[in-house]
A protein has these predicted regions:
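PLP-dependent amino-acid enzyme catalytic core
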Residues: 1-310
Length: 310
């Protein structure tokens, strides 16, 4: 039987789980969902497709229309990919502090890229995206930080995939918080199926907004903008673990060197948070699932892999 996708968007999802054998400690049962297997190499492919599907269904996005979005990078890449496949113009606004690889990939998909002052964080990018959209007839803002189509993608697909692939054997789920859509959607599915699943959110220690701290610069690209997004459901999270940028970098490097998994900085944060949880004696016989959001290839120019070119 032929298996041919109609467009690249049909390749999104059904990413694999792999056992983590070394970096989170010995004698623990940890598996990771590797989202780099999506066509644009990140978990953001999922909600980009979901947001565009919803905008098409509502009539807000017409053929030949324009999609505008503020992003730290991966959502911009994903929207640019799906937009290219469906014939939309795409304008991506991101802080200039994001990696050069992210910028280049957005442009490679034919999208327009607008860079904002890093001092303003993602909030400044959001304001600029709103200004651009207001001046372009037929433009919509994807609004990943407020759009219910974001967590809906993970309720419909990501969470169900994890449950199916583990045959319902999930005791703990650990994930970083960027928009919050991934952890909120996955947690909703897992909690509906088993209310005892323990949900752990990972945040940058330098910007501990989820535990009442103040926003501050940090180096974990993709985690925690300088505000708590509407798409994050705090009520479904049981615990928050804070991870230093340096620790996230260390775990991402170790994932490549010890597991053969070339992943990004936010994946390092997820693994570091998982290691904290997995070290607890009461979880020795429990299955812990984490999610690795993207590939390390778009961080080769950053501090994550500094010095490799020598």
């Amino acid at each position: 039987m032929a298996r041919i996708a109609s467009t690249v968007a049909d390749l999104i999802g059904n990413t694999p789980l792999v056992r983590i054998n070394h970096v989170v400690g010995d004698g623990v049962d940890v598996v990771a969902k590797v989202e780099a297997f999506n066509p644009a190499s990140s978990v953001k492919d999922r909600h980009a497709r979901s947001i565009i599907d919803a905008a098409e269904a509502s009539g807000a996005l017409a053929p030949g229309g324009t999609i505008v979005e503020a992003t730290s990078g991966n959502t911009g890449i994903a929207l640019s990919m799906v937009g290219a496949a469906r014939g939309y113009k795409v304008v991506i606004v991101m802080p200039a502090s994001m990696s050069v690889e992210r910028r280049a990939i957005v442009r490679a998909f034919g999208a327009e890229l607008v860079l904002t002052d890093p001092k303003g964080g993602v909030s400044a990018a959001v304001a600029e995206a709103e200004r651009i959209a207001s001046e372009r007839p037929g433009a919509i803002i994807a609004s990943q930080f407020t759009n219910p189509a974001n967590p809906a993608a993970h309720i419909a697909h990501t969470g169900e995939e994890i449950w199916a692939d583990t045959e319902g054997q999930v005791d703990v789920f650990v994930a970083g918080v960027g928009t919050g859509g991934t952890i909120s959607g996955v947690a909703r599915v897992l909690k509906d199926k088993n209310p005892n699943v323990h949900i752990v959110a990972v945040q940058p220690a330098e910007s501990p907004l989820l535990t009442g701290g103040s926003p501050a610069p940090h180096g974990i690209q993709g985690l925690m903008p300088n505000f708590v997004p509407d798409t994050f459901d705090a009520d479904i999270v049981d615990e928050v673990v804070s991870v230093e940028t340096a620790t996230a970098l260390e775990f991402a490097r170790r994932a490549a060197a010890e597991e053969g998994l070339l992943v990004g900085i936010s994946s390092g944060a997820a693994l570091a948070g998982t290691a904290v949880v997995a070290a607890r004696p009461e979880l020795a016989d429990k299955k812990i699932v984490t999610l690795l959001p993207d590939t390390g290839e778009r961080y080769l120019s950053t501090a994550l892999f500094a010095g490799l070119e020598d």
